[in-house]
Amino acid sequence: MYCVKDVVRSGGYTFNIGVFRLDLSVPQAYVNEVEAGYVLPENWDRGINAFYTSYYASQYYSDYKNSGSSESTYVRFNSGFNLLGWQAHADTTFNKTDGSSGEWKSNTLYLERGIAELLGTLRAGDQYTSSEIFDSVRFTGVRLFRDMQMLPNSKQNFTPLVQGIAQTNALVTIEQNGFVVYQKEVPPGPFSIADLQLAGGGADLDVTVREADGSINTWLVPYASVPNMLQPGVSKYDFSAGRSHIEGADNQADFTQISYQYGLNNLLTLYGGTMLSNHYNAFTLGTGWNTRIGAISLDATRAHSKQDNGDVFDGQSYQIAYNKYLTQTLTRFGLAAYRYSSQDYRTFNDHVWANNKITIVAIRMMYTILLIIIKTILGVKYVFS
């Protein structure tokens, strides 16, 4: 028979022979807790069979003196149905102007189904790829991706783990900007608090552990976030395959796009992806950092494009983002140098357009866009670019 201390580090037990009661003590870090408000996948309900639709309609008419009149009609429908656990979604528009009979267009039309075992969604039809790592592409095909809404609320966005060791039965208090945002009693031993629900990219966290003997330990946990950062242990995948469906392009292209993100620890998130097509490929690697001086993300993309006329373009694109909340002045500071790209860098959309012999306006000339955002607690927002 195993002793609790042999199986669980810092665990223990007491046995009261008078009442034949055995009390076990297991550190909070080793307890598999379900976040309040979260429903386990095996208890999910796919909903009832139903149809829905919503619409927006506008009618414009103008009468000009000595120059006739003009009239236009615009209608947009968002419709779909839920049947046997599958959902269909359609986004369609109707546009009619003077001298035309009107035209119906479908922006998206796809069938999807949630896959609880993968915490993801399978989607097939006319849709768009993710824009988190590569530029979004409209296409016809299939997409399988991690649906973050299937995760507990605290894991859908980046929040740090708060970890420590309690010497006795202790009270852990976490404050942000002077407000208590979390409080929990923990037994002796290691603890790990992962179910924080905080304002995105907010201020650093002040942690206080009050022991049963009255002693107090305090420390600071840095907290700032930028896009693509994930909580430690959380991963995000996205797979798309199909044929581009770019409006106005006669020559489309088959492609496959894969991306993956993983929260390694409180400090580091890793992410990357690839886009593969006939005569085109692109690869991205990036990191997100949560540090005492703020959150920083850096990524680099290398792309190769060979056009139908034989022209070859090899280029690079770099992206940096920064975010920091200054508690002393109650000011949020954000800096983004978005997409510095070399002259020969081509996105997949550029590649398709070039093969349609359509001139790309301002085609990927070397550029840097610098955006600085400063927002104070008074709601005053300053933007410099």
Predicted segment positions?
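Exposed, low-structure sequence patches enriched in small/polar residues
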Residues: F348, A362-S385
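Structured alpha-helical segments in the cores of large, soluble enzyme domains
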Residues: V75-S79, D254-Y260, T287, Y382-F384
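Compositionally biased low-complexity segments at domain edges in trafficked proteins
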Residues: P232-Y260
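Short catalytic-loop micro-motif centered on adjacent basic/acidic residues
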Residues: T269-T274
